[in-house]
Amino acid sequence: MPKSLENTNETPKSFFITTLGCPKNTVDSMAMHQSLLKEGLLPAAGPEASDFHLVNTCTFIQDATKETIQTILDSIDIKKQNKQKLVVVGCFAERAGKEISDDLPEVDLHFGTGKYDKAGEILRKNFPLEFKDLTEFNEDLLERLTTSKGIENYSKPYSYVKISDGCNRGCHFCIIPNLRGKYRDTDSNDVLEQTKLAVKAGSKEICLVSQDTVFYGKDTDKLMDLVRSVAAVEGLEILRLLYLYPDKKTEKLLDLYREIPKIAPYLESPLQHVSKSVLKSMNRTGDYEFFKSLFQKARDIRPDLEIRTSFILGFPGETMEDVEEIIRFVEDVKPEKVNLFPYSPQEGTKGATMDGQLKDKEIARRVNLVREAYLGTLKTIHQNRIGKIYPCVVDEVLDDGAIVRRLQDAPEIDEVVYVETKDLKLGQFGKVRVDSFYELDMSGTWVD
């Protein structure tokens, strides 16, 4: 009979997960976390204290790949000091498994995407002597451990719940379908179960994520039904929808923003460009006028809503006229949050083989032109926030105050407000008055 953690004096092995990349990777790390617990491992306070250090990687763009490689090298240095097993998982492992095997012998094991919930089984199979025979966890204990340390950014007042994996869009700049495969829905019952578990563990905000949220069920009505079900979970305060592809499905989905007050006043819709010719080259739909209309509809439905979008500069064939069209859009529509990416050709994508490739220096120049335009509009946006009071949540408690986040801002990626009020609690809801701003973040006063 396998032993239970609560009826043995043996000390089980421990693990720590370092997570790189987007919130979708955080969800995958959570799946690994639960799988490792079920196999008898316990979470460690940091990689140095772990017996197994897992690095969940990202390789979406060139900068992400560089960060992944550096993190692996840093983890190898940690391993030399502490002798733990180093396991590289996720997108980079999927893409560069042979290179990891050939060039990084210090990596004890690597595996790609689609196996996160089997991480414990994979480690047990590959390192049988490292495992204690601990598999029968008390259910209450397992829930407590699931929300404890052992994974970066896990113990927060918000949680991410992934509703699908993979993508069918086929954007010519994107490597994701090669790494994660075709689009696959997560069963709605599993989405609800994950939401309930997160709320029970203390999360007040749930962020629904995927590579393509509006593709869920291949039918907007099914997605809307799912959103309604998640919003109805008892104890949930805020529901945030992320990664909404800018098309007619998103336009229809906006009706839920009027129907369900729990949905955060926040629209994240990555446009990637506004020039019709560049979008066509990217194998994407839409144009300047449709995007402008979409964002205006969102603001009409929820006047307190703020918009986050992203643009890729320097895609093959892009002209300065195309860049100027993005600048005009930023200055005309004034999305509150703009993320800019320099195009980097990804092996295995159509974009990498297209004519009209631009030099890195020219791409950087174009990024800077759009950034300057955005920072100009952001200054005006910030000035209009001064003196206004916003609902907010405490994301981090500091010695001399706290970091709070308006509901118009998503966790980890958007602006925060620094307040000097003490005795606030993590996850506490209240209101903040914006008093001043920096380039991106703000400072304010807790008023509730």
UniProtKB/Swiss-Prot annotation:
Residues 153-382 form the Radical SAM core domain. [4Fe-4S] cluster 1 binds at C22, C58, C91. It comes from the Bacteria. Residues 383-448 form the TRAM domain. Binds 2 [4Fe-4S] clusters. One cluster is coordinated with 3 cysteines and an exchangeable S-adenosyl-L-methionine. Gene3D superfamilies: Methylthiotransferase, N-terminal domain, Nucleic acid-binding proteins, tm_1862 like domain. GO terms for cellular component: cytosol. Its main location: cytoplasm. One of its GO terms (molecular function) is metal ion binding. Its EC number is 2.8.4.4. It is found in: Cytoplasm. Its cofactor is [4Fe-4S] cluster. [4Fe-4S] cluster 2 binds at C167, C171, C174. It catalyses: L-aspartate(89)-[ribosomal protein uS12]-hydrogen + (sulfur carrier)-SH + AH2 + 2 S-adenosyl-L-methionine = 3-methylsulfanyl-L-aspartate(89)-[ribosomal protein uS12]-hydrogen + (sulfur carrier)-H + 5'-deoxyadenosine + L-methionine + A + S-adenosyl-L-homocysteine + 2 H(+). Belongs to the methylthiotransferase family. RimO subfamily. Catalyzes the methylthiolation of an aspartic acid residue of ribosomal protein uS12. The keyword Transit peptide does not apply. Residues 13-128 form the MTTase N-terminal domain. This is Ribosomal protein uS12 methylthiotransferase RimO. Coiled coil: none annotated. HAMAP family: MTTase_RimO. It comes from Leptospira biflexa serovar Patoc (strain Patoc 1 / ATCC 23582 / Paris). GO terms for biological process: tRNA modification. Keywords: 4Fe-4S, Cytoplasm, Iron, Iron-sulfur, Metal-binding, S-adenosyl-L-methionine, Transferase.
